[in-house]
Design a protein with these regions (language model features):
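Domain-level signature for proteins that mediate thiol-based redox and metal-cofactor handling
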Residues: 1-103
Length: 103
């Protein structure tokens, strides 16, 4: 497979992932973090970093809007639910493990 075709396939898969996340607003970011160690906000940060690597200035809210398909504040108001105490406890544990691994 040539490089251009690989890039096009990766871009198509990424667009499909974004659409899947947009279609499944019931899946909360904290659920993604707990299961896969990334969420929509991580994708926005990675997107912005990729833009910066190519000399494109992109503010984080602009990257979030690309990932969410709408301004983050709007998505949050429509779809984000309050994290449960169990979810928050699990996130704290993940953070502790990450910090321990960094030392």
């Amino acid at each position: 497979m040539d490089e251009q075709t690989r890039i096009e396939l990766e871009a198509a898969a990424f667009r499909r992932l974004l659409q899947h996340l947009r279609d499944h607003t019931d899946v909360q970011n904290i659920d993604l973090m707990l299961l896969a160690d990334f969420c929509r906000n991580c994708l926005a940060k990675w997107y912005g970093a990729a833009a910066k690597e190519r000399g494109i200035e992109m503010e984080y809210p602009a990257a979030q809007e690309i990932i969410y398909g709408m301004p983050y504040a709007e998505w949050k108001a429509k779809y984000q639910k309050e994290a449960t105490p169990e979810q928050l406890k699990a996130m704290e544990e993940i953070q502790r493990r990450k910090e321990a691994a960094d030392h």
